[in-house]
Amino acid sequence: MASLRKTHPLLKIANDALVDLPTPSNISAWWNFGSLLGLCLISQILTGLFLAMHYTPDVESAFASVAHICRDVNFGWLIRNLHANGASFFFICIYFHIGRGLYYGSYLYKETWNIGVVLLLLVMMTAFVGYVLPWGQMSFWGATVITNLLSAVPYVGTTLVEWIWGGFSVDNATLTRFFAFHFLFPFVILAMTILHLLFLHETGSNNPIGLNSNADKISFHPYFSYKDLLGFAILLVALASLALFSPNLLGDPDNFTPANPMVTPPHIKPEWYFLFAYAILRSIPNKLGGVLALLASILVLMVVPFLHTSKQRTLTFRPVSQFLFWTLIADVAILTWIGGMPAEQPFIIIGQVASVLYFSLFLVFFPLAGWAENKILGWS
């Protein structure tokens, strides 16, 4: 008789996704990040739910309610620190996951990849509205600066900004709706994640050599379920260590000051995981141009599959493209550093050069390198 997990309508879906899933036998630890992102999402939803039980989305009491959570609620300080630093780990895992996809040509599964890019945008929006909720100085001014960018949209810009604000400045209406969005988006992300997996399981996983692995597949459980558990343990230990030993390491000291519309902080900057995009935004002296570049810095990922010129899928056997890939990683690191620096020389010019290089790598150098490698191998 067939086992219940293979016949029950609900269990069968879980079984096909987590137990009997045929998986390439040679996938490396870089394939762990998908499940780690699932863990991050569940962790963020749970800690966020408990925070929402005690948080007050009102300009008069938001800052005090966060202080109340940290001082008076049972383990509130821990829940808050896990949630704030969990966001950082979420983005670390996302960037590793995207890097893996770029290195091993996973973007050739176009539907899965494009849903992934939409997921990235959703997570970024969620993190942005979440950062506003403690109503500290950087929360308020970050919200003011970033929402103000929409005023660069021709003709309807100002109306659009005031519509999002719910008034003529960032105020109570803004905070209330941002809290509503921050509560809603994670569940949208959860639904999109299921779609992401659905499309992935249509094709099966890619693998480090990028060749068809149908002849050599093994079941996901127990081999990769246990491999994932090791990743879970490492992530949770790292998150707990950061949240317990140095919870404010990645935060901004300005956010310990309650929001004051009359005092502008000397350097307005977002959380570290947005700094690369912020640097690209700032490197263009025109407001609308900067906003378009900011959008393009993420949406450029959507054109990557269409610019794949190589006859090989992965970079495993392509040293020229490998060099370009690591140049891209270094470039993003430089942009992250520049994004946290004041807008003055020499940081402006470094940011502009790094921004041009960022787009050139995606749109020019990677396609050219793929074409050249085909030529060298006599495959063209």
Swiss-Prot record:
Statement: the UniProt record of this protein carries the keyword Repeat: no
Topology versus the membrane: Multi-pass membrane protein
Subcellular location: Mitochondrion inner membrane
Alphabetical UniProt keywords: Electron transport, Heme, Iron, Membrane, Metal-binding, Mitochondrion, Mitochondrion inner membrane, Respiratory chain, Transmembrane, Transmembrane helix, Transport, Ubiquinone
Recorded GO CC terms: mitochondrial inner membrane; respiratory chain complex III
Any one GO MF annotation of this record: ubiquinol-cytochrome-c reductase activity
Residues binding a ubiquinone, per UniProt: H201
Annotated positions binding heme b b562: H83, H182
Cofactor(s) the protein needs: heme b
Free-text remark on how the cofactor is bound: Binds 2 heme b groups non-covalently.
Parts of the chain that traverse the membrane: 33-53, 77-98, 113-133, 178-198, 226-246, 288-308, 320-340, 347-367
One Pfam family named in its UniProt record: Cytochrome_B
Biological process according to GO: mitochondrial electron transport, ubiquinol to cytochrome c
Described function: Component of the ubiquinol-cytochrome c reductase complex (complex III or cytochrome b-c1 complex) that is part of the mitochondrial respiratory chain. The b-c1 complex mediates electron transfer from ubiquinol to cytochrome c. Contributes to the generation of a proton gradient across the mitochondrial membrane that is then used for ATP synthesis.
Miscellaneous field: Heme 1 (or BL or b562) is low-potential and absorbs at about 562 nm, and heme 2 (or BH or b566) is high-potential and absorbs at about 566 nm.
Family: Belongs to the cytochrome b family.
PANTHER family per record: CYTOCHROME B (PTHR19271:SF16)
Name of the protein in question: Cytochrome b
